[in-house]
A protein has these predicted regions:
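Short alpha-helix
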Residues: 169-189
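Conserved S-adenosyl-L-methionine
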Residues: 190-202
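Class I SAM-dependent methyltransferase SAM/SAH-binding core
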Residues: 52-97
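A short SAM/SAH-binding and catalytic strip from SAM-dependent methyltransferases
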Residues: 107-119
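Conserved class I S-adenosyl-L-methionine
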Residues: 1-39, 43-51, 136-162
Length: 224
């Protein structure tokens, strides 16, 4: 059984999100590429893996009227999110239990987490089930064979400084690019259009991987 919730509750990790990933300038170009075109007044957004709800703050820079629901496995992150954005909805969920997520949203976001947990396919399925229109997700891709073995590719929790007292690691999933598209297409049944954008970059600084270059790839999956 994974210990991912405890990993994201680590003080050094929580403190990183106190001041990062809260404004448009903080998000990656790959994330903004599709999201900026989806923003519309009055829209509803589901953010899976919301951390401290930073996307609520970012979206508020561009929209006056929207509803935002964020879910995360970290109790510490959700507590901070509720303090920062009391006007929005936040829920703690278990990694394989999204029963607190109800209804459908104009846009579902799953950004920055799929490559860092084992049940990422199920997470895509949940996000797709709960969108009325569009799903935006990102993966870390390679042209070589897929690596989903935590013994070969993993992510340490040395975010915002080292954490010598905590030895647990997360998977750092590297998905073959051709296989990734097949997976997204097979999960998102009934999709009318799948758009893709990505670029080459170094792996995360806290990751240990068998490759020195990956693709940060974002998918926009749209219903008819």
């Amino acid at each position: 059984m994974s210990n991912n919730a405890e990993s994201w509750n680590q003080p050094n990790v929580v403190s990183f999100f106190d001041t990062n990933r809260t404004t448009t300038s903080d998000i990656y170009p790959s994330e903004w590429f599709f999201l900026k075109e989806q923003l519309k007044e009055g829209m509803s957004i589901l953010d899976i893996g919301c951390a401290q709800g930073g996307f609520a703050g970012m979206i508020a820079e561009h929209l006056n009227d929207f509803t935002y629901t964020g879910v995360d496995i970290s109790e510490e992150m959700i507590s901070k999110a509720k303090e920062k954005y009391p006007q929005h909805n936040f829920h703690i969920v278990k990694e394989n239990d999204y029963s607190k997520v109800t209804g459908k949203y104009d846009v579902s976001l799953v950004l920055g987490i799929l490559h860092l947990h084992e049940s990422w396919r199920n997470t895509i399925q949940i996000a797709w089930n709960h969108t009325k229109s569009s799903l935006i997700l990102d993966l870390r891709e390679i042209f070589e064979e897929t690596v989903e073995d935590k013994n070969k590719s993993y992510f340490t929790m040395d975010i915002n400084g080292s954490n010598e007292d905590y030895s647990e690691v997360l998977p750092y999933n590297l998905i073959n690019s051709g296989e990734a598209l097949e997976i997204v297409n097979s999960i998102c049944t009934g999709a009318e259009k799948i758009s893709y954008y990505g670029y080459s970059q170094d792996p995360a600084k806290t990751a240990v991987t068998p490759t020195n270059k990956i693709f940060a790839s974002v998918y926009l999956v749209q219903k008819g």
